[in-house]
Amino acid sequence: FCLSRGLGDVYKRQTNPEAKIAYNPSGSGAGVQTFLTGATAWAGSDKALADDEVEQSKSVCTEGTAFDVPVYISPIAVVFNLKGVSDAGKHINMDAATIAKIFDGKITKWNDPAIADQNKDLKLPDTAITVVHRSDKSGTTQNFVSYFKDVTPDNWTYDLSENWPNEVGQGAKGTSGVISTVKQADGTIGYADFSQVGDLGTVAVKVGDKYNEISAEAGSKVIADSKQDDTVKGDNRIVIKINHATEAEGSYPIVLVSYDIVCPAYKDTKQAEFAKAWLTYVTSDEGQKAAQDAAGTAPLPSSLKSEITKSIEAIKTK
């Protein structure tokens, strides 16, 4: 994901000019699996580690098990390309049930009454809806469908997974693949990290009795209304249980928390020193500001700072 590459450049300029950072934006699923083989010092993921992945990390961490530290918050945009709407800079209003039905192939036309009734001011065409989803294992996918599971479970009965669960629409690899595919054809709809949306149209999502447009600020309001998940296994972990059903004013409920995943101890002391210095930087006020400037992310809640510092301090450098 380009945010880590961009932050890496800032980190080198401002903190450690001699650091050599090689970043492969392969997606959360591939990144975690590469980390669990011991091929990388750390991984970035848009979902927390599963319990079996924590257990598996014993084979790559010199001591203990890997842990996840929140590094940024980003809303997930429901993006679309619809002639006369997205190219006119207009949003389309939708509630959770409508979005879920579209991605489950139950709503197939843009002028379906379920959409039209929520958009009285728009003249929606009789254009077929083409769903675009991730073809690869993806934390963004899991966060996206978690919203359906929490808010409109009757309309989304699939098991929660990083893999897209149905045969509706067409798959595209990575965030860039989804964005590129949506841009190529009229009538398309997909989902992607807000930082990558560009000039595509976005859905304003219903929260309570209002439709809220996507923004970093709106996404951060959901996390402020969420709690830590105290059921996860492993030490030093900070995992947010996102409250997708929030009715906080001005909030945008489809959001992800991105984590950096590290070991508490490494065979190579230099790797440990880098992991500790990197996490210290990206979770600092300076690092959070750099992320916000680079990709429009929302800063982490101040309430997490002391726990994040404690987790980072658990990395042994001697």
Write out the residue ranges for each language-model feature.
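Ligand-binding pocket segment of bilobal, Venus flytrap-like solute-binding proteins
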Residues: 32-34, 41, 137-232
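Extracytoplasmic
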Residues: 16-18, 30, 40, 64-66, ...
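Single conserved hydrophobic/aromatic residue that forms the stacking wall/gate
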Residues: 1-11
